[in-house]
């Protein structure tokens, strides 16, 4: 066993017995007063450059930022003297630290926000659904929407991933798409040919009807002879799921402008072609489809609905 030197004995005798005084002498305590030797050491370290000390300070800020959530969870409030300014300074200096902090969060920063009509659908943030009602309109995170959660098992046809594939598989199905074709023919005989040369119109009708229920399309023309489609949905409220918005914006958003508005007592999704972009047509037998549509029988209720909605669209333009 090594002999105990007198200096070691003196040092032990000078150490305070009170634990509180021991903490005051610890270098990490806030009331600790550095000795001349420790001050000399700090000066020698500072010669390494300001950048290293700044990096060390940011690392300390980062270590506190990583534990800020856990402190709030354990104690209910933040008991440290760590300011928000220091926190955001550390986040801005270390991008990875910011991502780590977001991973520790239990709830999203922004779940829902109010929106106003008319609203462009292609400008909405991805992963959100649209809820419209007489009490207000909101854009809600799909994972926090009870309607989207309850309808998460809704089957989405694989053909919806392609505009042209959906058009090719459904353009000859006259009876299932009777409302689309009757409205197209009611607009004008030439509108049938124009509608068949714009596959995105039938695609938008199929996707919107699949997710939003019964709809009635009304057609009009722009100044260049291209068709504009108004999809009217009856009811006091409307929910457009995030999957529906994603399919519409990704597949026809580059060539068509998509907007939702309130026309009279009905919600309306307007599908209008962009002026500088043209879509690729799909080769189909237009004459055979026209003959099938011309002889199509439909009830007076559907014809009256198309007439009323057409008048409503014309009045809304004025």
UniProtKB/Swiss-Prot annotation:
Protein name per the record: Nuclear egress protein 1
GN (gene name): NEC1
Highest taxon above the source species: Viruses
Function: Plays an essential role in virion nuclear egress, the first step of virion release from infected cell. Within the host nucleus, NEC1 interacts with the newly formed capsid through the vertexes and directs it to the inner nuclear membrane by associating with NEC2. Induces the budding of the capsid at the inner nuclear membrane as well as its envelopment into the perinuclear space.
Signal peptide: none
PTM entry text: Phosphorylated at serine residues in the N-terminus. This phosphorylation regulates the localization within the inner nuclear membrane.
Subunit structure comment from the entry: Forms a heterodimeric nuclear egress complex (NEC) with NEC2. 4 NEC further associate to form dimers. Interacts with capsid vertex specific component 2/CVC2; this interaction directs the capsid to the host inner nuclear membrane to initiate budding.
Record family assignment: Belongs to the herpesviridae NEC1 protein family.
Keywords: Host membrane, Host nucleus, Membrane, Metal-binding, Phosphoprotein, Zinc, Zinc-finger
Chain intervals annotated as zinc finger (CCCH-type): 129-239
InterPro entries (UniProt xref): Herpes_UL31
Gene Ontology, cellular component aspect: host cell nuclear inner membrane; membrane
HAMAP family recorded: HSV_NEC1
A Pfam family recorded for this sequence: Herpes_UL31
Source organism: Epstein-Barr virus (strain B95-8)
Record's subcellular location: Host nucleus inner membrane
GO molecular function: zinc ion binding
GO biological-process terms attached to the record: viral budding from nuclear membrane
């Amino acid at each position: 066993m090594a002999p105990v030197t007198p200096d070691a004995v003196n040092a032990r005798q000078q150490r305070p017995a009170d634990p509180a005084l021991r903490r005051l002498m610890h270098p990490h305590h806030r009331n600790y007063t550095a000795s001349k030797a420790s001050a000399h050491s700090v000066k020698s370290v500072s010669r390494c450059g300001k950048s290293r000390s700044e990096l060390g300070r940011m690392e300390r800020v980062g270590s506190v930022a990583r534990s800020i959530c856990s402190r709030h969870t354990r104690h209910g409030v933040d008991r440290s003297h760590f300011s928000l300014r220091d926190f955001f300074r550390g986040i801005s200096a270390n991008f990875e630290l910011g991502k780590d902090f977001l991973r520790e969060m239990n709830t999203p920063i922004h779940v829902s926000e109010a929106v106003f009509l008319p609203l462009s659908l292609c400008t909405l943030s991805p992963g959100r659904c649209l809820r419209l009602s007489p009490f207000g309109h909101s854009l809600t995170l799909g994972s926090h929407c009870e309607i989207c959660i309850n309808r998460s098992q809704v089957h989405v046809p694989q053909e919806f991933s392609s505009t042209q594939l959906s058009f090719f598989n459904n353009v000859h199905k006259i009876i299932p798409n009777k409302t689309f074709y009757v409205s197209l023919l009611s607009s004008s005989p030439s509108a049938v040919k124009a509608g068949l040369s714009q596959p995105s119109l039938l695609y938008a009708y199929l996707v919107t009807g699949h997710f939003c229920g019964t709809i009635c399309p009304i057609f009009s023309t722009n100044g260049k002879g291209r068709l504009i489609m108004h999809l009217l949905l009856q009811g006091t409220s409307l929910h457009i799921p995030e999957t529906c918005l994603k399919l519409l914006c990704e597949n026809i958003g580059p060539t068509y402008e998509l907007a939702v508005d309130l026309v009279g007592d009905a919600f309306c999704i307007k599908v209008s072609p962009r002026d500088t972009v043209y879509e690729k047509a799909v080769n189909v037998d237009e004459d055979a489809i026209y003959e099938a549509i011309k002889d199509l029988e439909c009830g007076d209720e559907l014809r009256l609905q198309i007439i009323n909605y057409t008048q409503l669209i014309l009045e809304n333009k004025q």
